[in-house]
Every structure is written in structure tokens, then in C-alpha cells.
Amino acid sequence: MKTRRSMRLLAVLSVLVLIIAACGDGGGESTTTEADPGADTTASPGTTEPMTDTTEPMTDTTTAGGDLGSVTVASGEQIQIRSLEAISGDVAFLGTPNQVATEMAIEDFGQILGHDVTIGTGLDDLCSAEGGQAAAQTIAADEQVVGVIGTSCSGAAVAAMPVISDAGLAMISPSNTSPALTSDLEGTAGTDYQPGYYRTAHNDLFQGQAVANFVFNDLGLTTAAAIHDGDPYTQGLAGAFQNAFEELGGTVTTFVGVNKGDTDMTPVLSEVATGAPEAIYFPIFQPEGDFIVQQIAGVSGLEDVTLIGADGLLVSDFLSLPETEGMYFSGPSLQFGENTNELTGVSATDFLANYEAREGEAPSAAFWAHAYDATTMLLNAISEVAVEGDDGSLTIDRAELRDAITASSFAGMIGNLACDEFGDCGSQEIQIVEHADSSVTDATQLPVVFTYSGLEG
């Protein structure tokens, strides 16, 4: 089967024949130009690489083709992608359903030009910079890897992406939300943006704006405190809330961090109490979130404060705590209903039924649909750029793969997906739910009290 690359190769060979005919065996001088390391190295469909007089034999993993190289998958071999999620420790509730959703999407999507797709052994980002970087180095060392689904946590992505990007790979995250990884939504790249990074999760600038509008306009509260744990996700989201709340006219009385691993939250809560806030927004994880709700009643001045968590706490273990009754939570829309991924034909309802049949329980966190859509986005892009050889092998150009992901446009379980220039591809709708009864531990069953779908103010 001939594809775009086959046609370009024929064109290059034709030009080469003409050059040889014109020059004979003369020793004309040729020059090459080194790429500017800071320049955009994405190959466009109409460009070709400079020809040299050295030919490298092709192997199963030969790097060739565009500026970022390519992967050749031998006939009968599997296409290798990787899952990089938090699958152990306190945040495994987030990464495990993401990885399962990736595996299910691969099964539903099927073969690509006769080749199966595999994630190999799932890698663990540990929800930490150290875990993200170590796993990224493992991925980058394997020249057979085509792309990555992950990470679970923004902090892991910040450390992983320089390695992933330098290796010419693409990574699509289902649950990273830190604005630093993409952009400020006004055309300026985030401080940790790297080429080749994409996500189907929302940008937390939207979530911060949503919570600020809910607290100020719907609840009618004008003072609030914000608590983070110092990582890019929690600090970024708490900061986005602070900025948006103050722009609306509210006052953030305290902006403070806890340390991961802390069990005594009394000192931090006592500091918060000095500002007499009407609400506290704490977009952190367990177990620190557990200790806050369990200890806050004992802090004078905070007995009646309104508590608001975020998607990191929208998990059954946390929702089952009696102290969470009366809380609000912000996070991505979970009202997927019969939304169907057009690339596989699987609806959100069908997926959940299949997930429970496979795992014996519902997904434990909010980003399962984002993981499914992210995986199909990657698989579809691979299918669009893969070139099939006469021997049944596939060649996948990494620069073209990034281009294909960037150009993605399809209906997924989370809604319509399309990527901006910095890799924000997913639905930006944020919902706030109310948790009145700790016997209800399925986040999808919590009543939606506020919906937000765009920046305001």
C-alpha cells in the first residue's frame, strides 16, 4: 500500500536521478544546515530530508525519516505504546482506572494495519517528579515505543516531559490539569510546556474560574482560604482559584500549603482560622484531605466554614467519610450519558458496564473517559501516519504523529475533542457537585449544582 511518504520518496528518488545525470561523477560541493535547537522541528508533509551518501540499514527500531526520527515495526510485531500512570501508593485510585481504560480502548480500537497494539508492562509515575522522570527515561531508552498515555499527576508530567519530548515522542495525559503544562489560554506557553505534550483533561484555569464564580456568585461568599500541598497540580489550581476569586471582588484570607505526609493539620487550620474565611478550597489528595476534614471541627472559628474539594478527592474512600457530608467538589463533567467515542463506537454507558464486568467495580476516579478518549486519539493518529511496507512492516514517523494528534478532531465520550497549539484537547466543562450523604460514594451520582464552560470576567 502506498501512502503519502511513499509518494514523497518516489519524488526524492526522481530528483536524485536527475541530479546524478546532470553532475555525472563530479565532486560538486554540498552543504547541510543544522537545525536550530530552539526552532520548531515538526516536519511538514511537503518537506524532505537532505540526502547523504551514507545509508543506514533499516532495523525494527531504526530512527530515520523526519527530524524526530521514526519507528519501524516488523511484520507480525506489536506496535508499542506505554501507559505511565500512578498505579501504586495513595494516588493509585487515579492511575489504575486510567490504565484499565487505556487497555480497554486498545481492545476496542483493534489492530492497526494488521498489527496488535500493546502497552507492555504498565509504568508507575508514583504521582511524583522522581517517578515521572525515572519512568520517562525507561520509555525513552526503548526506541520501539511510539507514544505514551499519561501521566496521572501534573508533577510527574513536569519531570517526565523534557525526557519524552527530547526523545521525539508524544504523550497524551487523561488527568494532568496544571496550566503550566500547556498555556495561559491567551496564547502564552506554560512554564513547563514541552512539544509533544497533549491532554484530554481540562486546563485548571477553567476550574479555578468555575469555583470562584460558584463561591462568589452562587453561594454569595466573599472570603475564602486556599490550601495546597506544593505540587504543580494543587498549587496551580489553588492559585487559579485565588486569582479568579480576587478578580470577582472576593478576598483570599490565607493561601497556605501542607506537606505531603503530614498527619496533624491543626497548625495549618489554626493559621487559616485567623483570617475567618467563609469557605476553604483545598484541591489536594488523600490522605491529607482526610485529616483536614477529620480535624477541622476541633479548630475554633472553622466550625461552620464551607468546605470545597476538587477532582483529586472525588473518590469513594473519601466520599465515604461522614465528615465530608455537606462538602462541594469541583471537577470535570461526569454526565457522559450515551456520549459515544466515534472511533470505536463505544458509549460511556457501555464502557462503564464493560469496566465493571472486567474489574468487579466502577472506576475509582473521574478521568476514565478522558483516558479512553486519549488512547483512541493516539491510536487513530498512528493509523493515519503509519506506512505499510510490501513485507507487512510499518513505519511511523514521529513528527508526523505529533502533527496528526494536533490535527485530531472527533467525538469522544467526554464530548468533542480538538487540540489547540499547546496541547489542550479536551472538554473544558467544569461541574460542581454537592455531597449530602456519605452513603453515596459514586461521584457520578452526586447532584450537579453548578456548571461552567468558559472563562469569564
Where are these predicted regions, by residue range?
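Extracytoplasmic ligand/sensor domains, especially the bilobed periplasmic-binding protein
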Residues: 145-256, 306-332
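Segments of small-molecule ligand-sensing domains
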Residues: 355-368, 379-442
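Solvent-exposed, acidic/polar segments of extracytosolic/periplasmic ligand-binding ectodomains
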Residues: 45, 60-68, 79, 325, ...
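Hydrophobic alpha-helical segments within soluble ligand-binding/sensing domains
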Residues: 132, 192, 198-225, 264-266, ...
